[in-house]
């Protein structure tokens, strides 16, 4: 029972109480760049979740055989291999989304969340716990991406996942789209607003004053 509770805590903690974006301020670049559409945000979420979970699992499995002097190189090799798998899969089965995500799929290799969990958790814990930690951090990252992507697409173009929700005036509807929300700077303010909201509701996440 205790072990089950530990696994549950590892899985759920990164989603709210220890979210990699709202608390640790990691993975911000892709959160700004790929959230102009909900579809892109969902695909990036799945990609990061897959890479984080399986890189944690594989690194944890061989952690006792990795020389300390080359551990970062080994971690990056495993992460890069998984990113290549994701990139080739998207090119084969979702080419249009792959083109929209552009270099940001490849840049998962350098995502602070992926590297951070490999070094801080997978190198010190067993494979199953490490896998669940990767899933949890991928979900925590994805929750923010999906919130930002949904907000930007809905109020920026009046649609969600390509389906019209707010009919645009240009098409005879009533909603005047806000083009600013489709630009990357808007994501910066939305993410900032989410961080503010989370820390207002959870004062324990506010950094102490110096």
Curated annotation (Swiss-Prot):
It is found in: Cell inner membrane. It is a multi-pass membrane protein. Its EC number is 7.2.1.1. GO terms for cellular component: plasma membrane. The keyword tRNA processing does not apply. Keywords: Cell inner membrane, Cell membrane, Ion transport, Membrane, NAD, Sodium, Sodium transport, Translocase, Transmembrane, Transmembrane helix, Transport, Ubiquinone. One of its GO terms (biological process) is sodium ion transport. The chain crosses the membrane at residues 42-62, 66-86, 103-123, 131-151, 154-174, 178-198. InterPro entries: NqrD (IPR011292), NqrDE/RnfAE (IPR003667). The keyword Cell inner membrane applies. It holds the Pfam family Rnf-Nqr. GO terms for molecular function: oxidoreductase activity, acting on NAD(P)H, quinone or similar compound as acceptor. It catalyses: a ubiquinone + n Na(+)(in) + NADH + H(+) = a ubiquinol + n Na(+)(out) + NAD(+). Its main location: membrane. Composed of six subunits; NqrA, NqrB, NqrC, NqrD, NqrE and NqrF. NQR complex catalyzes the reduction of ubiquinone-1 to ubiquinol by two successive reactions, coupled with the transport of Na(+) ions from the cytoplasm to the periplasm. NqrA to NqrE are probably involved in the second step, the conversion of ubisemiquinone to ubiquinol. PANTHER family: ELECTRON TRANSPORT COMPLEX PROTEIN RNFE, NA(+)-TRANSLOCATING NADH-QUINONE REDUCTASE SUBUNIT D. Belongs to the NqrDE/RnfAE family. This is Na(+)-translocating NADH-quinone reductase subunit D. It comes from Psychromonas ingrahamii (strain DSM 17664 / CCUG 51855 / 37).
């Amino acid at each position: 029972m205790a072990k089950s509770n530990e696994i549950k805590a590892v899985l759920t903690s990164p989603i709210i109480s220890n979210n990699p974006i709202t608390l640790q301020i990691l993975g911000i670049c892709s959160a700004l760049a790929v959230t102009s559409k909900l579809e892109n945000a969902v695909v990036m979420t799945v990609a990061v979740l897959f890479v984080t979970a399986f890189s944690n699992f594989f690194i944890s499995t061989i952690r006792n055989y990795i020389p300390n002097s080359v551990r970062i190189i080994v971690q990056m090799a495993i992460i890069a291999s998984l990113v290549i798998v994701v990139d080739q899969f998207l090119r084969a089965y979702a080419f249009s989304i792959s083109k929209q995500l552009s270099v940001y799929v490849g840049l998962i290799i350098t995502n602070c969340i992926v590297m951070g969990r490999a070094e801080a958790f997978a190198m010190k814990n067993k494979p199953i716990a490490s896998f669940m930690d990767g899933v949890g951090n991928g979900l925590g990252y994805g929750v923010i991406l999906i919130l930002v992507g949904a907000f930007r697409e809905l109020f920026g173009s009046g649609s969600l996942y390509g389906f019209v929700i707010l009919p645009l005036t240009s098409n005879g509807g009533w909603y005047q789209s806000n083009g600013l929300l489709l630009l990357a700077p808007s994501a910066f303010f939305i993410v900032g607003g989410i961080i503010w909201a989370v820390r207002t509701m959870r004062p324990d996440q506010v950094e102490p004053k110096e």
